[in-house]
UniProtKB/Swiss-Prot annotation:
Localization per Swiss-Prot or TrEMBL: Cytoplasm
Transmembrane segment boundaries: none
Organism: Chromohalobacter salexigens (strain ATCC BAA-138 / DSM 3043 / CIP 106854 / NCIMB 13768 / 1H11)
Entries under InterPro entries matching the protein: Cell_div_ZapB (IPR009252)
UniProt-listed SUPFAM superfamilies: Mitotic arrest deficient-like 1, Mad1
Chief location of this protein within or outside the cell: cytoplasm
Protein name stated in the entry: Cell division protein ZapB
Taxonomic superkingdom: Bacteria
Organism classification: Bacteria, Pseudomonadati, Pseudomonadota, Gammaproteobacteria, Oceanospirillales
Gene: zapB
One CC-aspect GO term: cytoplasm
Homology family: Belongs to the ZapB family.
Record keywords: Cell cycle, Cell division, Coiled coil, Cytoplasm, Septation
Chain's role: Non-essential, abundant cell division factor that is required for proper Z-ring formation. It is recruited early to the divisome by direct interaction with FtsZ, stimulating Z-ring assembly and thereby promoting cell division earlier in the cell cycle. Its recruitment to the Z-ring requires functional FtsA or ZipA.
């Protein structure tokens, strides 16, 4: 194999390694963002369930008073 071909191969391998490293970093960032978004969703779900519970309490309270003559 000529030196020129070897140099080209070496450059392509180096480019591939750099690309893989960048993709690994990007994947890690996306995993972190995914975790953050899941936590945010869980918080919204918890708050929404709290509000729905309050509405249910109001509805249950109204149901009792409307049935009483």
């Amino acid at each position: 194999m000529s030196l020129e071909l070897f140099n080209q191969l070496e450059q392509k391998v180096q480019n591939a390694v750099e690309t893989i490293e960048m993709l690994k970093m990007e994947a890690e960032e996306l995993r972190e963002e995914n975790t953050r978004l899941k936590q945010e969703r869980d918080e919204w779900e918890r708050r929404l369930n709290g509000l729905l519970g309050k509405f249910q309490e109001i509805e249950d309270g109204n149901g009792e008073t409307s049935q009483t003559p």
